[in-house]
Regions:
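N-terminal binding-site loop/beta-alpha segment at the start of enzyme catalytic domains
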Residues: 1-80
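Structural preference for beta-strand elements that scaffold enzyme active sites
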Residues: 13-17, 50-51, 78-82, 129-134, ...
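Active-site mouth loops of central-metabolism enzymes
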Residues: 22-34, 99-115, 141-143
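Acidic (Asp/Glu)-rich catalytic clusters
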Residues: 8, 70-76, 123-126, 179-183
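Active-site groove signature of glycoside hydrolases
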Residues: 122-141
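Short, acidic/polar
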Residues: 31-44, 110-124, 172-177
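N-terminal small/glycine-rich loop or linker at the start of catalytic domains
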Residues: 9-28, 82-104, 134
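Beta/alpha (TIM)-barrel catalytic core signal, keyed to glycine-rich beta->alpha loops juxtaposed to Asp/Glu
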Residues: 3, 138-327
Length: 327
């Protein structure tokens, strides 16, 4: 199976990773069957999905705890494990991020907070190192949390062998350059799908220049690109889909019309629409890592099918043209 580098690190991994936000449960995702999610993570590794991504804020530590339980039953060397730092609810800071299930979550990118985050994550995950550590959200006030301090803390953790690669999520091109100026940056994690392509112009040129990998989250646009959503599909009050621009009537119709053009390709490649979309998304940007969420073995198996799709050049060109036409 073809593998991709993670930035300038020595880590190589297949393009498809497993996101575990939903495994955290809570009001965003509802109750979670933890035993089933442990099996889902095991299934992912068995199917060749080696990059498992989590974060402390997913379920307020719950996702990390479930991932840690799964790792007890998996050869650690077979897993590329990433988590995040910089969101804090152990104490209050001047920067409120959001309220999650009644808990006020703050941003804190100080060296002390980052080091404490990593030590706590290592304990919950039951491992002695992280393959990738992301800063989850960036500070809106670099006077409060200087980027140099943030990067130096991560570089120190790398020197200690507690992390292998440095990542950042939800960044700007200027911040990417700042990370590299003060230390290094191997990978960024950003929202990217066939419907949400802003990073192609805003971030990708800088990443290419500096040898930084990109990992895309939400490639199926919260399920809109799976082929299972219709114009009549509704979502519960409070669902983030209701405020997602891609789910608004005009854009939703564009998305569904786009998928309808590819029905013949799902037959040709004997795959689901979701698998076809994942395979194409991986082709949109050379070397792109794609992160797909799942919390059941069945969902994992559906995502993993994308690893076996080898798009013909002509089909890829046709599909990219279709995508460009609605961008």
């Amino acid at each position: 199976m073809e593998k991709l580098n993670i930035g300038r690190s020595s880590i190589e991994v297949p393009f498809l990773g497993m996101g575990t936000w939903a495994i955290g449960g809570g009001s965003w995702w509802g109750d979670n069957d933890d035993a089933l999610s442990v099996k889902a993570i095991q299934t992912a590794v068995e199917q060749g999905i080696r990059w498992i991504d989590t974060a402390p804020i997913y379920g307020l530590y719950h996702s990390e705890t479930v991932v840690g339980e799964a790792l007890k039953h998996i050869d650690r060397d077979k897993v590329v494990l990433s988590t995040k730092c910089g969101l804090e609810w152990r104490h209050e800071t001047p920067v409120l991020h959001k309220v999650v299930d009644g808990t006020a979550v703050y941003r804190d990118l100080s060296a002390q907070s980052i080091i404490e985050d990593v030590e706590d994550s290592l304990r919950r995950l039951g491992t002695d190192h992280l393959d990738v550590l992301y800063t989850h959200w960036q500070s809106p006030d670099l006077g409060l949390y200087p980027l140099e301090e943030t990067v130096e803390a991560m570089m120190k953790l790398k020197e200690q062998g507690k992390i292998r690669a440095i990542g950042a999520s939800n960044v700007t091109a200027d911040l990417i350059r700042g990370y590299c100026r003060y230390g290094q940056l191997d990978v960024i994690q950003e929202k990217y799908s066939l419907l949400t392509r802003r990073i192609e112009k805003q971030l990708l040129p800088t990443c290419r220049e500096l040898g930084i990998s990109v990992q895309a989250y939400s490639p199926l646009e919260q399920g809109l690109l799976t082929g299972r959503v219709t114009m009549e599909t509704t979502f519960p009050e409070g669902s983030t889909r209701n405020s997602n621009p891609s789910f608004q009537p005009a854009r939703r119709k564009q998305a569904l019309d786009l998928l309808a053009k590819w029905d013949d390709l799902t037959e040709k490649y004997d795959c689901t629409m979701a698998q076809l979309v994942i395979a194409l998304t991986a082709r949109m940007i050379p070397g792109l890592h794609v992160l797909c969420g799942a919390r059941t073995p069945e969902q994992v198996l559906d995502n993993a099918g994308a690893l076996n799709i080898k798009l013909d050049g002509a089909d890829a060109v046709r599909m990219k043209w279709d995508v460009d036409a609605i961008s």
